[in-house]
């Protein structure tokens, strides 16, 4: 969820506009500090968006949005809101690579009050279900001059073959001295939640997931070497199977996340209720991990590890 590892193309992975910087005015992307038409320039830019080149400092990420249900033959339905909070720190590995030590939580909220919820009345089932928070501890990433290999999700995804591609986003200039870019990640991989063991939680034998990011950054800040960290506003959308705790089983349809996002250095810019809830329930998530971990599982894989299959619903 969210700040996800930037996956390489090939096999089950595809990018929309990943390297189409020719669409932009190239002169606006080549500056005195970094060149956004190169892999190394994009690496430095992304490191300053998701982290801070000053490794003593923490970078925070937030998101606020809505989760909607999509079923054939009817209008999309807003179900509940959600809040994202993350904490990250950079570690420089080489001229062409950073590690991003990163933790992330996602809470679900009531659409009207905005309060974090622990249960939800599923209108599709007319049934109350227990809400399960997303706690990605850790979700470490590599930020490199080349597209890194994807996370394995415990061996479910195999690394692509072939030569590495330079990590170049489709940056372009926008009115108001802003640079913007978009990235799309498309995944199709075996599900950990198998229907035979998880009949109410599993949407099927395969996970079909798409994530779409947009980034908006001040162009002058991008070329200012004194700015070791960049304030970034953007959006994040995710198409994903029914959330397992909704107990939809293999019913036709899927979930759509849509959110506005931000990254910044000042914790005071995060929502107070989200920070307070994190301090109370997951205090370790307020700071990044102290060391790199190769084990970064998605929320679906974590659900399989931490939850138990719900009992089958009795027939009337």
What is the predicted function of each stretch?
Residues 25-104, 109, 298-315:
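N-terminal segment immediately downstream of the Sec signal-peptide cleavage site
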Residues 71-221:
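Predominantly extracellular/secreted and cell-surface proteins with exposed
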Residues 232-316:
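Edge beta-strand at a domain terminus
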């Amino acid at each position: 969820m969210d700040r996800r590892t930037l996956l390489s193309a090939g096999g089950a992975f595809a990018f929309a506009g990943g390297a189409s910087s020719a669409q932009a005015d190239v002169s606006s992307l080549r500056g005195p500090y970094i060149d956004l038409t190169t892999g190394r320039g994009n690496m430095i830019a992304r490191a300053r968006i998701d982290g801070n080149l000053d490794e003593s400092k923490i970078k925070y990420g937030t998101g606020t949005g809505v989760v909607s249900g999509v079923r054939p033959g009817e209008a999309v339905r807003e179900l509940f809101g959600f809040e994202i909070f993350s904490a990250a720190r950079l570690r420089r590995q080489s001229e062409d690579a950073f590690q991003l030590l990163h933790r992330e939580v996602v809470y679900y909220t009531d659409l009207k009050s905005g309060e974090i919820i622990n249960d939800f009345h599923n209108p599709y089932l007319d049934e109350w279900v227990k809400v399960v928070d997303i706690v990605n501890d850790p979700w470490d990433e590599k930020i490199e001059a080349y597209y890194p290999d994807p996370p394995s999700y415990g061996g479910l995804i195999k690394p692509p073959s072939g030569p590495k591609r330079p990590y170049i986003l489709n940056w372009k200039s926008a009115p108001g001295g802003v640079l913007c870019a978009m990235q799309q990640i498309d995944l199709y991989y075996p599900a950990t939640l198998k229907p035979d063991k998880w009949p109410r939680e599993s949407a099927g034998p395969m996970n079909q997931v798409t994530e779409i990011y947009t980034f908006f950054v001040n162009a002058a800040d991008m070329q200012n070497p004194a700015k070791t960290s960049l304030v970034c506003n953007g959006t994040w959308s995710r198409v994903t199977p029914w959330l397992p705790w909704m107990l939809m089983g293999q019913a036709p349809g899927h979930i759509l996340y849509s959110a506005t996002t931000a990254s910044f250095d000042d914790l005071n810019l995060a929502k107070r209720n989200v920070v307070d809830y994190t301090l109370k329930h997951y205090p370790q998530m307020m700071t990044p991990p102290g060391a790199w971990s190769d084990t970064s599982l998605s929320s679906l894989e974590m659900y399989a590890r931490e939850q138990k299959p719900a009992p089958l619903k009795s027939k009337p």
